[in-house]
Design a protein with these regions (language model features):
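Structural preference for beta-strand elements that scaffold enzyme active sites
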Residues: 33-35, 60-64, 84-90, 155-159, ...
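Active-site beta-loop-alpha junctions enriched in small/polar residues
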Residues: 39-41, 66-68, 90-96, 161-163, ...
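Acidic (Asp/Glu)-rich catalytic clusters
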Residues: 51-57, 72-86, 103-116, 149-150, ...
């Protein structure tokens, strides 16, 4: 007990000396540690159900909920039925859909820059960056955390829908500030991902200038982040993810997936309903389970990573109350 604690404190004092975050957190230097994380719970009923089923399956190890969405309350209630799950808060400043629209939780007069001409959230990250102030962003993300807490839900971590909180250095600073104020770990990879779009790639590359100081401060809990996906059809999707698992590097990696069901509700929202169904099914398949075992991958959660991280050990246990 004491030897382990002493070793972790020693590593905390010299985190940049470790070959990767995983080694600093106490994993073997050659260990491939993986978070499989489902975004967008709260978007709609079918996404909620599909995400819960995937998390219960065991290979999807974490998920995050969107507080401004109409189905957020149901998402929290479903999370309460499975407290063993690892549930975070997907801080949301955009609403990209054509017919499904939501508004900020903060008073409109307090966050005018977050509103489009119809009073909804902007559809794009660039619009948020062009119109919103850091103060407005902070007001809104605090409102989302407070809304979750009022519902008896203390998230295991915070992350950012569409990467909006990485759009400017000022947005990132308020994201970090709110996380530290509440004592909740926040998603920030040591190595920026290639991403699935030029905009996303640019966002994370801008953030990369911060990573050494964040590692040194003990706030980074994973090395690599993968936000894109591939493969048309279920079999190709399984093969795609199998290849990604086989290509894992030593350290802590987070895969981001999106779960859904092929039902009319989700079809009415997005043309990517099939892709969400493929992700949900792939990550409950025996084929991927076999590849994970074959590659010796260690599946983990945000809670476990935070427990290993001296910066967050004091307040990581999520609470899902009545």
């Amino acid at each position: 007990m004491y030897a382990v604690e002493a070793e972790m404190v020693m590593k905390y004092e010299r985190p940049l000396a470790a070959p990767h975050v995983g080694a600093w957190l106490g994993y073997p230097a050659d260990a491939k540690v993986l978070l499989v994380h489902a975004d967008d719970m709260g978007l709609c009923h079918s996404v909620n159900v599909a995400t819960l089923e995937a998390v219960k399956g065991g290979m999807v190890t974490s998920a995050s909920l969107m507080a401004p969405c109409d189905w957020f309350v149901e998402a929290v209630e479903l999370a309460k039925t499975y407290p063993e799950g690892d549930w975070g808060l997907h801080l949301t400043l955009t609403c990209e859909w054509k017919t499904l629209r939501w508004r900020p939780l903060a008073e409109a007069s307090a966050v005018p820059g977050l509103l489009d001409r119809h009073g909804f959230m902007h559809r794009s990250v660039l619009d948020v960056a062009a119109h919103a102030t850091p103060a407005e962003v902070e007001t809104e993300i605090r409102a989302q955390v407070e809304h979750a807490l009022r519902l008896g839900f203390r998230p295991s971590h915070l992350d950012s829908h569409m990467g909006t909180l990485f759009a400017t250095s000022e947005f990132f600073e308020v994201y970090r500030k709110v996380a530290l104020d509440y004592g909740i770990p926040y998603m920030a990879p040591r190595v920026p991902p290639a991403g699935s779009s030029p905009v996303e790639t640019a966002l994370y590359r801008r953030f990369a200038t911060y990573t050494p100081q964040l590692v040194e401060a003990g706030e980074i809990v994973h090395d690599y982040l993968q936000t894109d996906t591939g493969g048309q059809g279920l079999e190709e999707r399984i093969a795609y993810w199998a290849d990604q698992v086989r290509g894992l590097r030593p350290g802590v990696t987070q895969f981001i997936i999106h779960c859904g069901q092929e039902v009319d509700e989700l079809k009415a929202i997005t043309g990517s309903y099939r892709s969400r169904t493929w992700d949900a099914t792939a990550w409950q398949s025996p084929q991927l389970r076999h590849v994970l075992e074959e590659e010796g991958v260690i599946l983990t959660t945000w809670r476990e990573l935070a427990r290993r991280q001296p910066r967050w050990r004091g307040g990581v246990e999520p609470e899902i109350g009545e």
